[in-house]
Amino acid sequence: MKFLEKLTSKKGQIAMELGILVMAAVAVAAIAAYFYATNVSNTGKQITNSTNQTTQALADAISDATSQMSNITD
């Protein structure tokens, strides 16, 4: 019970400490949200680049196949 008496005797200090703790938690959450948002943005760009490269590779393969077919019929 002496522990509780010590806590209640310094109410102002506890309020300040809790405020600092909440402020630190908010700062950590803001930093985590920033990195999450940047990673989501980068992932979208990487997916777009990968899709474009795949589409280009397939278009090249189709072009090669059609040119070989035209060589067969000549």
Swiss-Prot record:
Q: What is the name of the protein in this document?
A: Major structural pilin EpdE
Query: Is the keyword Phosphoprotein in the record?
Result: no
Give a short account of its post-translational modification: The N-terminus is cleaved by the prepilin peptidase EppA, which recognizes the class III signal sequence. N-glycosylated. Glycosylated with an N-linked branched pentasaccharide glycan. May contain glycans at three sites. Glycosylation is AglB-dependent. The N-glycosylation does not occur unless the signal peptide has been cleaved first.
Q: Which residues carry this modification: Pyrrolidone carboxylic acid?
A: 13
> Primary place of residence?
secreted
Q: Which residues form the propeptide?
A: 1-12
Motif QXSXEXXXL covers 13-21
Domain of life from the UniProt record = Archaea
Kindly state which keywords UniProt assigns to this record, in alphabetical order: Fimbrium, Glycoprotein, Pyrrolidone carboxylic acid, Secreted
Q: Where would you find this protein in the cell?
A: Secreted; Cell surface; Fimbrium
The record's domain comment reads: Contains an amino terminal motif QXSXEXXXL, which is part of a class III signal sequence.
Supply the source organism for this entry: Methanococcus maripaludis (strain DSM 14266 / JCM 13030 / NBRC 101832 / S2 / LL)
The Gene Ontology CC terms held by the record are: cell surface; extracellular region; membrane
Phenotypic effect of disruption: Deletion mutant no longer produces pili at the cell surface.
Q: What does this protein do?
A: Major component of the type IV-like pili.
